[in-house]
UniProtKB/Swiss-Prot annotation:
Hydrolase among keywords: yes
Protein source organism: Photorhabdus laumondii subsp. laumondii (strain DSM 15139 / CIP 105565 / TT01)
Record-given protein name: Probable mRNA interferase HicA 1
Any Pfam family: HicA_toxin
Keywords of this entry: Endonuclease, Hydrolase, Nuclease, RNA-binding, Stress response, Toxin-antitoxin system
Gene: hicA1
Enzyme class: hydrolase
Entries under Gene3D superfamilies matching the protein: Hypothetical protein
Amino acid sequence: MKQSEFRRWLEAQGVEVSNGTNHLKLRYQGKRSIMPRHPSQEIKEPLRKAIIKQLGL
């Protein structure tokens, strides 16, 4: 899954996404996580699972 697709999926789940310097800040119901900002690259499965776990989705 590309990072841009994952970002759209997160936004559909209600995650608030804001831009950091070299990354995206993710917020969901008081929980926070970060994601690198490389929209055309594939996001590795362990990172995707970690973000989902950190946000409690």
